[in-house]
């Protein structure tokens, strides 16, 4: 069995092409467990998770990437956020009936993919591509060609392992400032495209790479763990409350006796009573009771 929830980087010695392979199981399950999503929505989030992991691994700096789908369809938002430590979280918003076998365009409708790159230091960058491809992978390949001018291919697979959702993917990309031959890149892409879902999700990464590229010279680097991690906190909720008009906060307190702030990503609840609100307004740090 493979070591799930790991990302592997690799490099072709005879071509100016690099690759990545990722599989996720536990991380995906944690993203899905607090929600009752229809299966097509689960599949999209699985693909987004794989894609975000692969894209985050292309960063040459500390920071994070958010990949989101937006549109006017029954799933009007799906988003995964990840950082250079491969810490991921995600959520989707459903506002209508989801057909059982809905494809990406049926789910999102008229929409687009937004990729937001936020370095720990430096300026934020945002790229937008229309949802013109039939798959998420095709849309992201289009993004790379438009924004990075780097030939890039993504191969994403979703399925189940031992009855639990899992997903995996591979990325091939021409090295920046290198003169890779198109024929060489196409050859490697053709090999990669033959990967079967079962192989990618159930075989160790090194065996997958050997099956695909055993006639090539490939250097495989140490893997990086992928994990679910939410960045919500009581302090962030308190900061958000500071931005609301006092009369709105007081109205909620008068009606409900407390304010319940819920994180859509992880399901945590943060409760604030009148005393907490008074402390927030006095710039004090409220106590940290938290309901899971």
Curated annotation (Swiss-Prot):
GO MF term list: identical protein binding; protein folding chaperone; unfolded protein binding; zinc ion binding
Keyword set includes 4Fe-4S: no
Entry GO CC: cytoplasm; cytosol
Induction of synthesis: By heat shock.
Subcellular location: Cytoplasm
Post-translational modification note: Under oxidizing conditions two disulfide bonds are formed involving the reactive cysteines. Under reducing conditions zinc is bound to the reactive cysteines and the protein is inactive.
A Gene Ontology BP annotation from the UniProt entry: response to heat
Keywords tagged on the record: Chaperone, Cytoplasm, Disulfide bond, Redox-active center, Stress response, Zinc
Record has Metal-binding as a keyword: no
Superkingdom field: Bacteria
Location, primary (coarse class): cytoplasm
Disulfide-bonded cysteines: 230-232, 263-266
Pfam families documented for this protein: HSP33 (PF01430)
Role this protein plays: Redox regulated molecular chaperone. Protects both thermally unfolding and oxidatively damaged proteins from irreversible aggregation. Plays an important role in the bacterial defense system toward oxidative stress.
Family: Belongs to the HSP33 family.
Protein name: 33 kDa chaperonin
């Amino acid at each position: 069995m493979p070591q799930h929830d790991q990302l592997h980087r690799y490099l072709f010695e005879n071509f100016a092409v690099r690759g990545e392979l990722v599989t996720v199981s536990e991380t995906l399950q944690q993203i899905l467990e607090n929600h009752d999503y229809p299966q097509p929505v689960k599949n999209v989030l699985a693909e987004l998770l794989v894609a975000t992991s692969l894209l985050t691994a292309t960063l040459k700096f500390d920071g994070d990437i958010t990949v989101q789908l937006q549109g006017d369809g029954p799933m009007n938002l799906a988003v995964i956020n990840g950082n250079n430590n491969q810490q991921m979280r995600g959520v989707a918003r459903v506002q209508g009936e989801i057909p059982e076998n809905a494809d990406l365009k049926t789910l999102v409708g008229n929409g687009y993919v937004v990729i937001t790159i936020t370095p720990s230091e430096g300026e934020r960058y945002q790229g937008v591509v229309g949802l013109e491809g039939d798959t998420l992978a095709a849309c992201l390949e289009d993004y790379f060609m438009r924004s990075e001018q780097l030939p890039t291919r993504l191969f994403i697979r979703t399925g189940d392992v031992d009855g639990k959702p899992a997903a995996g993917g591979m990325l091939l990309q021409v090295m920046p400032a290198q003169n890779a031959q198109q024929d060489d890149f196409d050859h490697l892409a053709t090999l990669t495209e033959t990967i079967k879902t079962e192989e990618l999700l159930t075989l160790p990464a090194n065996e997958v790479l050997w099956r695909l590229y055993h006639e090539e010279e490939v250097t495989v680097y140490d893997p990086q763990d992928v994990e679910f991690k939410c960045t919500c906190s009581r302090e962030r909720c308190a900061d958000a409350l500071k931005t609301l008009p006092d009369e709105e906060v007081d109205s909620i307190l008068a009606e409900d006796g407390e304010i319940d702030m819920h994180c859509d990503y992880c399901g945590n609840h943060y409760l604030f009573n009148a005393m907490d609100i008074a402390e927030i307004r006095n710039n004090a740090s409220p106590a940290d009771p938290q309901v899971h």
